[in-house]
């Protein structure tokens, strides 16, 4: 009887921990700490589905590459708890402003800030690296370098999650640079070259309404709306871009 009670206790604790993890993610997304304008974009960016697909857990050491204004950082900073750590690898342009953002709230207590053009973390020390809508900024040598540093920082078996504006198959390199859309083929090619294995793809962030032939590239669409009021209703109806969602693994 005593053994049976112990078994029930263990099962209860395990179930509770699993529920707590899921609840924490939901709470992190619903948190009042988030910038209201960011939260309104959940309908396009699907943070719950995306982070669940990647499999990020709150006790992991996670590197977010080039978080920019911190759209995902606000969620991850609330979600990741001791002994987990979030490392924000920020581009030089955003570093000073991001320091102020981190000093503005206690939720950034487990966030470390490093330069994107660094080694990111100690070799083989990170559980997960993620990047959201950044590859078009790195096309060329920068992308190779950042993927290489990400691979080195990850533990064997660690994961690399990528979300990026998706170009039509066969789109040439110069068009990718000017339009802000990158082909899946190119993203996968660069990752494999650095030693990653492709684990899975998801259509969580797909948008079949996006024709990808807009006058100002991906920036024609929300949230940028580069044409201002020209065809605004049309582009708002399309919504945010069609995106690939890829999961890689370090062997």
Task: Place the predicted regions along the sequence by residue.
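Conserved class I S-adenosyl-L-methionine
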Residues: 59-68
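Helix-to-beta-strand junctions that scaffold the AdoMet/dcAdoMet cofactor pocket
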Residues: 80-81, 138-140, 154-156
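A short glycine-rich, Lys/Arg-flanked "PGG" loop and its adjoining helix->strand segment in the class I
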Residues: 144-156
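Conserved Class I S-adenosyl-L-methionine
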Residues: 173-199
């Amino acid at each position: 009887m005593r053994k049976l009670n112990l078994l029930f206790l263990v099962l209860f604790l395990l179930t509770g921990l699993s529920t707590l993890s899921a609840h924490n993610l939901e709470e992190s997304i619903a948190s009042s700490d988030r910038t209201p304008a960011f939260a309104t974009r959940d309908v396009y960016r699907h943070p719950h589905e995306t982070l669940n697909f990647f499999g990020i857990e709150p006790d992991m050491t996670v590197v977010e590459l080039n978080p920019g204004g911190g759209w995902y950082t606000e969620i991850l900073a609330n979600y990741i708890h001791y002994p987990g750590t979030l490392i924000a690898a920020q581009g030089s342009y955003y570093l000073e402003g991001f320091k102020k953002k981190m000093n503005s709230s206690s939720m950034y207590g487990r966030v470390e800030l490093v330069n994107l053009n660094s080694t990111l973390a100690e070799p083989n020390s990170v559980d997960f690296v993620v990047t959201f809508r950044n590859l078009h900024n790195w096309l060329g040598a920068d992308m190779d370098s950042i993927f290489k540093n990400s691979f080195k920082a990850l533990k064997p078996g660690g994961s690399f999650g990528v979300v990026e504006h998706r170009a039509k198959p066969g789109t040439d390199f110069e068009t990718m640079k000017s339009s802000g859309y990158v082909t899946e083929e190119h993203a996968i090619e660069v990752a494999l070259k650095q030693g990653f294995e492709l684990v899975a793809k998801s259509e969580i962030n797909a948008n079949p309404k996006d024709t990808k032939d807009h006058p100002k590239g991906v920036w024609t669409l929300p949230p940028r709306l580069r044409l201002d009021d020209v065809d605004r209703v049309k582009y708002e109806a399309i919504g945010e871009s069609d995106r690939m969602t890829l999961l890689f693994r370090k062997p």
